[in-house]
Amino acid sequence: MKNIIVLLSFFSTFLSAANWLMLQGSESKVGHHPWGFLQLRFQDNGGEVQINNGINKTPFSYIKPTLQHQSELQVARARLGLRGSLDDANKINYFLLGEVAQNGVNNSLATHTDNYLMDASITLKHLPLYIRFGRFKYAGSEEGNMARFASPFIVFSTVGDQLMLERFLDTKTPYVSNPDLYIAKPAEGTGAYRDTGIQLFQSFKLAQASYLTLSYMLGSGTGIKNEIDFHNHTHYGYVSYENILGKGKGYKQEAFKLYAWHQDGQRDLADRIRYGLGTTYFYDKLHLEAEYMKGKGMIYTGAKDTDNNINTNNWQYSLQASKKNEADGYYLLGTYELAKQFELIARYDVYNRMTNLKNEYRQFKTLTTGISYKLKDYDRVDINYAYNKASAPHNQAADQILKSFGNLLSIQYTIVLK
């Protein structure tokens, strides 16, 4: 944690820092705007496969979300939406977005957890504090807030994927040999950094080029599920300070930002707590970013094969539910524009899972490098190569399996419709 604070302090000496909360939650002008994006992706996983007594021990050697192949060409995202205003005064805004691709939203572990509606919200701007209700992205991690079509990093960091992308299990019965462990098929798609609820938010101008943004949301804790149950409510808090540095607007605004967030929610199995802080800097050709995250309770511990038939895999999610279970991690990233169309990218991330139990502790380290070739606006081709390393320092058997963890090549073509 000390090292992360030092790094954040280093970045803060600089005077993509887009304000995602305001960009996605409100409209700047009257009208109706169809939009969307398509991402075609090829991935090749260089991991080894280990099967012991018919059980596949290496889910990390396969391509998500189905874990069926080690190389795969897929439609990663296919989203179409409509946003705009419902009145001439631009006081009532709406935001709709659908997803038809067979990804983690609609086909987690090949179980067809179809839920095609990602966002459906109304924002009321009559009061000093804007009021948004419906289903939408909650304010939190920068990695989650960022529009996926704007990121040259094809997959989330390991800490973002495992700690923040919530998985919902179709069970309330613990594993036989461990009352804290739950293993089951997905009950719905991954949470996609979204929830259903009501949010109060606003960005306040402090000086000529600086802003304070605040947000509080009461969510149902159900992700993108079409059923609402406020018995499992979640509180989402967010604060950021942003200093505008130069040109650009919207997603391409040159700025420096500091932010912090906290989430505290109830679930059927246990409480789920997440919090973090970070910074972003974007000016001219250079973009820098750092974020630290920590979680307690509802710790996702990977996919498990529950079928001892050597010819088939029956993948299910596993969770260590108790609030005593903890995990933390961080990422550091940078991008640099070499020329008008070429951008070099690099990200280093670390995830420490189940830090409270030596035998269950796992550490993941990933260095992602790549290049982005811009075609037009946000249309581009991204190439990422992730060097992966995982270990179980206090569990020799698990550590041996994790040596099969391989590197991942990802190539993605993004087309933005607007």
Residue map of PLM features:
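Outer membrane beta-barrel
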Residues: 22-51, 62-224, 231-236, 240-247, ...
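Solvent-exposed, glycine/polar-rich loop segments of beta-barrel outer-membrane systems
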Residues: 55-57
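Residue-level detector of intrinsically disordered/flexible regions characterized by low predicted structural confidence
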Residues: 4-5, 81, 349
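Outer-membrane beta-barrel pore domains
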Residues: 21-29, 47-49, 63-67, 108, ...
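C-terminal/domain-terminus segments
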Residues: 219-238, 354-365, 370
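Cleavable N-terminal export/targeting peptides
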Residues: 1-21, 418
